[in-house]
Swiss-Prot record:
PROSITE patterns: HOMEOBOX_1 (PS00027), HOMEOBOX_2 (PS50071). The keyword Nucleus applies. Induction: By vent2B downstream of bmp4. It comes from Xenopus laevis (African clawed frog). The gene is vent1B. GO terms for molecular function: DNA-binding transcription factor activity, RNA polymerase II-specific; RNA polymerase II cis-regulatory region sequence-specific DNA binding; sequence-specific DNA binding. SMART domains: HOX. Residues 128-187 bind DNA. One of its GO terms (cellular component) is nucleus. Keywords: Developmental protein, DNA-binding, Homeobox, Nucleus, Transcription, Transcription regulation. It is found in: Nucleus. Its main location: nucleus. This is Homeobox protein vent1B.
Length: 270
């Protein structure tokens, strides 16, 4: 028989030595947790709605599976904190600069507009315009009298009038400017009302007793309806010098005798 080189005690001793060596090697190695790297942000993750308490990061993180050894273990789910996830994404090489700027703008606090001092149109309710001066009837009466006397005041006259009315020179100057503009508008309105509206008169043509000298186009001129000729109302007395008069009797008789008895020299040439 072949002698067995291995006994039970030897096998047990070797197994104990291997177990001790395994413990030493495990104690010398650092513990590395099985935590896979998170995926880079996608368009869906970038545009998903965010909440204030950070629940969206925990709800939408992807579950990962970690296998230890050949036999395999149960699935382990990893949910990183929002701060760690933000640091990991910020250090990723695949994350572009444009995306980081967008995230920074989204995460940065925006100035809150105070709507108490603004109305619904966005305009400030606090009136920044200069308040109008309310003149008393006595002041207006004196200003009107000064304006009727002189429409343009000098520096000394304006100062004197402002002192008498207990007003500032700027107020007096502004009132005179507005009063001149008002007077100018009144004059323009009066001139516009005095100008009569244009009247369209019918087109007239000269009168020709025998008709128009040249034939005219029917569409070029206005043709009144045909009416019988009416003599002018005023009586026309012709000049006697241009009316032919009958010859006297003796002139007619002398002319007849000459025609009946021609002179003798006429017979010579016949």
């Amino acid at each position: 028989m072949v002698q067995q080189g291995f006994s039970i005690d030897l096998i047990l001793a070797r197994s104990k030595e291997e177990a001790a060596d395994g413990k030493d090697s495990m104690s010398s190695r650092p513990h590395i947790p099985c935590a896979p790297q998170p995926l880079p942000p996608t368009k869906y993750a970038k545009e998903m709605p965010r909440r204030k308490d950070g629940q969206d990061v925990q709800e939408h993180t992807t579950s990962f599976q970690c296998s230890l050894g050949e036999q395999g273990n149960k699935l382990q789910y990893f949910s990183p904190s929002p701060a760690a996830l933000h640091r990991t994404w910020g250090s990723s090489d695949e994350f572009s600069s444009a995306g980081s700027e967008d995230d920074t703008n989204e995460c940065s606090p925006r100035p809150v507009r105070n709507f108490q001092d603004t109305d619904h149109n966005g305009k400030s309710t606090k009136s920044d315009r200069r308040l109008r001066t309310a003149f008393s009837p006595q002041q207006i009466s004196k200003l009107e009298q000064a304006f009727n006397k002189q429409r343009y005041l000098g520096a000394s006259e304006r100062k004197k009038l402002a002192t008498s009315l207990m007003l500032s020179e700027i107020q007096v100057k502004t009132w005179f400017q507005n009063r001149r503009m008002k007077l100018k508008r009144q004059i323009q309105d009066q001139q516009h009302s005095l100008v009569p509206p244009p009247v369209c008169y019918p087109q007239t043509f000269p009168y020709y007793p025998g008709g128009f000298p040249v034939p005219l186009n029917s569409g070029s001129f206005y043709q009144p309806p045909a009416l019988p000729f009416q003599a002018p109302q005023h009586s026309y007395i012709p000049d006697q010098r241009f009316i032919p008069q009958p010859l006297p009797h003796h002139v007619r008789m002398s002319g007849a005798l000459q025609e009946q008895y021609p002179p003798l020299f006429r017979a010579q040439y016949i």
